[in-house]
Amino acid sequence: MSVSNPEFSESSILRPVEISRQTHPHKKGASIALMFAAIGIVFGDIGTSPLYALKECFSPDHGIPFSADAVYGVISMVFWAFAIVVSLKYVLFVMRANNHGEGGILALMALALRTAPNGSKRSLLIIMAGVFGACMFYGDAIITPAISVLSAVEGLEVISSDLTRFVLPITVLILVILFFIQKTGTEVVGKLFGPIMMVWFITIGLMGLHQVIQNPAIFAAVNPMFAIRFLIEHSLQGFIVLGAVFLVLTGAEALYADMGHFGIRPIRMGWFFIVMPCLLLNYFGQGAMFLANPETISNPFFLMVPEVFVFPLVILATAATVIASQAVISGAFSMTSQAILLGFVPRMKVRHTSDREIGQIYMPFVNWTLLFLVIVVVLAFKKSENLAAAYGIAVTTTMIVTTLLAAIVMRVVWRWNTILVTLVIGAFLTVDLAFLTANLLKIMEGGWFPLLLGAICFLFLMTWYQGRKLLRQNAVNNGIELKGFIDALMQHPPHRVEGTALFLTAHVDYVPVSFLHNLKHNHVLHERVFFLKVSIWDVPYVKDEERITLRDMGNGIYVVRAVYGFNETPDMGQIIELIEKSADLKFDMMNTSFFLSRDTIVSTEIPGMAMWRERLFCWMYQNAGRQSDFFKIPANRLVELGAKVEI
């Protein structure tokens, strides 16, 4: 007989009937404090885009001769990209589509899944879209540290061309140090992120202000006709430049993804009062400088200041890009943790690096994989401008998925009128698709990299998801109904022994294989038996009073369901404590045994996935982290019993 190994849920994501809503009702003072904290985390990526964005827009490779009209056209596109994509789409619309206060592609996917029946085609399409968007985020997590740090260190070339040969070694050294310190956590140094980024934004704002004071005519670029005329006059070349303009928007997704940490209001305040004004001042300042001195296009950001200030600016820019990289690395850790609980990624080691901040985690496998790929990218592409195409495709794809999932939420969850949803989402999608198409024109110049990486990641995640689905089907098809089995067992009960036995199960209605093997080999039944199932709800957090449900089957046998949100980490010690409180049952841990099933998965000709994907799933399953480590089960109280499972 073969049943599946205990996992989190019968379906990939369980829908709670009702759950307390997690919101951020911040008072004014708290909102301001959180706004400054958000400056150091949320806006690092988009805040460092001035280092390379306009430099790429005016690259000679685009084939557009320099002119004042070209400057006005590009700056106009930058202004309206901020207005439409960031301010209107993300800050005012998408951030409303939060999952109990939590943002991000997987949280939005979980919210959209509530609108589709389990197992339906619509449910599968939502899952595939969300997973692909998440996979493209990993491309962003690789390219952001590479292009950001590289562009900052390239400022040394402004000081002297002799320093060019040091750019790559210094960049690699900074990145290696950044990834090596992840295991120690960033709780202490993280307190400096906010002040450093505030200095950064004030600095780039003043740099731009100095330039626009000398040439205030650049403010005429707020007229959208300059952007429209530029695109019409330059046709294909203008469209290619549009793809480069998108670089000013990289990091916009972070405003939504990090919403759960700070809340909507602090992020909106930070964007409208500090970040957007400083960024626009810098971009308009670069444009004003171009009008006065076209030669500054070679490295406009660092040429905005006198030569004596270039080296301090390189230091500040490097610090800002490291902070931006840290934010995206932490985002990769958080998203991977969510993906594990939602059933898309195998269990892997997760270590909390702070006793006070639950969201600060470290994942060794993710960390070292990112470091390897980031170094490969830096050494392969060599210059920040060579990474521009790859960066744009990674981010635009994620943005399009976010727009599509938000459309489902607007129509089905918010019950907006179909015509209104079509108009709003149609407008946003038109802009998103224009940016994507513009970036796809440069697919051979590096745009292939995030697409290849995303496709490989998508294959692994969907293989894991579908493989677990086959295991659940196997358990249902071959399982023994729990109540009937216990009733039959109690008619001729085996010898009862002292102590408590807790069996993890994937299905509360079926007998876990570890229980069957214990009866078969040991011929005993503990005086107290618990069948425990851990389920993940499609909300970020669950209150402790809603976490445990217990059913007494009589004869000292209990069925327990423990529920967690996708931003939480299941903890056996906490579950035991809550069982004791909810049912007045006492546990002696030295007299309690935890039984797990350690299965061997075998690929067969049984209809399911393609044979090569089944073998890939078997390999992933055997190399996944141990359940006992994931649930924090004491090693000296653990009993593992093996079983063979065919898929």
Swiss-Prot record:
Keyword annotations: Cell inner membrane, Cell membrane, Ion transport, Membrane, Potassium, Potassium transport, Symport, Transmembrane, Transmembrane helix, Transport
Membrane topology: Multi-pass membrane protein
Cell wall biogenesis/degradation found in the keyword field: no
UniProt subcellular location: Cell inner membrane
Keyword Cell membrane recorded: yes
Catalyses which reaction(s): K(+)(in) + H(+)(in) = K(+)(out) + H(+)(out)
Alphabetical list of InterPro entries matching this protein: K+_transporter, K_trans_C, K_trans_N, Kup
TM region(s), chain numbering: 32-52, 74-94, 124-144, 166-186, 193-213, 230-250, 271-291, 300-320, 322-342, 361-381, 390-410, 418-438, 443-463
Source species, domain of life: Bacteria
Pfam hit, one: K_trans_C
Biological function: Transport of potassium into the cell. Likely operates as a K(+):H(+) symporter.
Alphabetical list of PANTHER family matching this protein: LOW AFFINITY POTASSIUM TRANSPORT SYSTEM PROTEIN KUP (PTHR30540:SF79), OSMOTIC STRESS POTASSIUM TRANSPORTER (PTHR30540)
Name under which the protein is recorded: Probable potassium transport system protein Kup
Name of encoding gene: kup
